[in-house]
């Protein structure tokens, strides 16, 4: 133990950025080295090769900016319209169409094997990495070790590191060349290691699963993941609708489920005013409630003095079908799921 700590001290003392020591006592070296030792012990117990363990722990770096990013994730929430303007812009739509032309055979194979249509695969690819254009900034081993040391989600990030080591070991990858986001997502579809370990697929049959450098592996892995989530290729994701001006906003939680005839009976229509399909399809309902409340308040303040009741603005919302909730198991965000649906429609 002592010799191991000495060797790590030599390797990492100058690797840890000086800012980590800016506040006396802010960085606990003993805790850092004990954590590295626990990683080594666990990795060995889970049959990860000694070569991989040594490679992973050779020159670990604590990165304060990652902790800062994790602690200071923005609480600012874009309106749905602003979010869609950013994520489903004309450039992303155009690039998606180019990618469909570039990879027609691969997309067809993914659809045939996993039942995921090309426009859906492309929508996830576009949202996650702008079709592989997002640059990975952080070496994932350092990111996971840093977040483990931070302590708030040590078990989660420890599991991610071990999964990454197993993936690199199995696929003969240089773990020190695997880069991703500060939170540990990687590749064309931004999988975390535990997701990759469970759903990763060797799409080109070269004996390795590489979702960072191989588009085929990435697409097959995404298709496999969505398939396992239960994707229904014959079902739409959302339906944009208009609600009555005085509609109860408490029903816009995505959790209240009703049949389309039941929603229709409450005054919900298609955007052109036509009736919803009278099928027994069950759907939830979501909208930008905060935005609607602001608009309603503004409408009240500018109402005519002689008006007994302020006119209420038209409410746009989305009926949400089962595929919507499958998307939320990929990324638990209503806005993200609506953006996927919108981009997929543009690429259909």
Write out the residue ranges for each language-model feature:
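Flexible, glycine-rich surface segments
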Residues: 175-290
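Acidic/His-rich structured neighborhood in mature extracellular/periplasmic domains
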Residues: 82-221, 227
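Solvent-exposed loop/turn segments at secondary-structure junctions
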Residues: 60-62, 128-132, 185, 232, ...
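C-terminal soluble interaction/assembly domains
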Residues: 244-348
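An acidic, Gly/Ser/Thr/Pro-rich helix-cap/linker signature
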Residues: 23-111
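Bacterial N-terminal signal peptides that target proteins for export
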Residues: 1-9
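Cleavable N-terminal signal peptides
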Residues: 9-10, 20
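N-terminal signal peptide c-region/cleavage motif recognized by signal peptidases
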Residues: 15-19
């Amino acid at each position: 133990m002592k010799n191991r700590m000495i060797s790590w001290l030599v390797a990492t003392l100058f690797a840890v950025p000086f800012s980590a020591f800016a506040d006396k006592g802010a960085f606990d070296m003993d805790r850092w080295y004990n954590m590295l030792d626990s990683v080594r012990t666990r990795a060995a117990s889970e049959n990860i090769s000694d070569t991989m363990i040594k490679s992973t722990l050779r020159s670990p770096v604590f990165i304060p900016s990652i902790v800062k990013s994790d602690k200071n994730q923005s609480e600012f929430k874009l309106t749905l319209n602003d979010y869609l303007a950013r994520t489903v812009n004309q450039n992303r739509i155009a690039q998606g169409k180019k990618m469909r032309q570039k990879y027609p055979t691969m997309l067809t194979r993914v659809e045939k094997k996993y039942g995921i249509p090309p426009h859906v695969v492309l929508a996830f690819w576009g949202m996650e990495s702008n079709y592989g254009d997002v640059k990975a900034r952080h070496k994932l081993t350092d990111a996971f070790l840093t977040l483990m040391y931070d302590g708030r989600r040590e078990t989660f990030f420890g599991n991610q590191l071990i999964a990454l080591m197993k993936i690199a070991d199995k696929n003969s990858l240089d773990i020190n060349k695997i880069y991703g986001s500060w939170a540990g997502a990687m590749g064309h579809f931004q999988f975390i290691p535990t997701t990759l370990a469970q759903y990763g697929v060797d799409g080109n049959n070269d004996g390795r699963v590489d979702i960072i450098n191989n588009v085929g592996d990435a697409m097959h892995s995404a298709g496999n993941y969505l398939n396992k989530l239960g994707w229904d290729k014959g079902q739409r994701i959302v339906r944009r609708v208009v609600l009555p001006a005085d509609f109860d906003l408490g029903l816009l939680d995505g959790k209240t489920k009703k049949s389309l005839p039941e929603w229709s009976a409450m005054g919900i229509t298609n955007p052109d005013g036509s009736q919803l399909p009278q099928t027994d399809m069950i759907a939830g309902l979501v909208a930008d409630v905060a935005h609607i409340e602001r608009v309603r308040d503004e409408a009240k303040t500018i109402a005519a003095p002689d008006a007994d009741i302020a006119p209420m603005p038209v409410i746009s919302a989305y009926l949400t079908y089962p595929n919507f909730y499958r998307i939320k198991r990929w990324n638990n965000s209503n806005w993200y799921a609506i953006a996927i649906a919108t981009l997929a429609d543009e690429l259909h």
